Amino acid sequence: FVAIQQGYVIAVDGVVVHCGESIPPAYGEHPITDYGDHLIIPGFVDTHAHAPQYCNRGLGMDKELLPWLETYTFPEEAKFSDQEYARLVYGAFVHDLWRNGTTRSILFGTIHKDSTLVLMELLQKAGLSAYVGKVNMDRNSPEFLIEDTQQSLADTKEWLEASAQFGPLVKPIITPRFVPSCTSELMSGLGNLAEAYNVPVQSHLSENHGEIE
């Protein structure tokens, strides 16, 4: 990276068009805001985070992934069927993103479409940019988190259409949790939705021996 000790950042319509030690003549008449000795840096980018795991960070460091999910994460994610709980936790999560300068992120939500919309709403209100996923799971999971395949696809379609309200900063991303928790039928249906709505896909792949075996 390049550090400019005393310099200028020029933005036009929200887009940075120049960084340097002097102001180009074309922008010489524009208003200037002096930030003194403050640091001006690009926002940080987190390309993989689980927003509903905010409250169980650092727990179960002695466990492999699958036992960790069963012991800590799945019971925590089940709580997000309650939108009030989701708003409380996601509010704290989004505030921490903002406070630490993470301005762009790619996030997992939970299987609950309405709580995932709450997360997207809070990100938009905070002025943060993100891809947000409603998680899909229809096998090899606790009963309280297993979705019916067709209902999972219907909920995802409904969520994709509702996501249009959030504009250019906060966008949906198709999110099958990982192969062990998704049937071929679900994966195929999600692929069709990704193509129909022109949205990207995120998941996990081969994170540990237990998952692969």
Q: What kind of feature is each model-predicted range?
A:
Residues 57-128, 152-166:
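Alpha-helical scaffold segments that flank or form the walls of functional sites
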Residues 9, 14, 37, 48, ...:
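Divalent metal-coordination and catalytic microenvironments
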Residues 50-54, 105, 208:
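General alpha-helical segment detector with a strong preference for membrane-spanning helices
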Residues 114-213:
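Metal-coordinating catalytic core of metallo-dependent amide/deamination hydrolases
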Residues 1-41:
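Histidine-rich, glycine-flanked metal-binding segment
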Residues 37, 74-78, 141-144, 175:
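Short amphipathic alpha-helical segments at helix-loop
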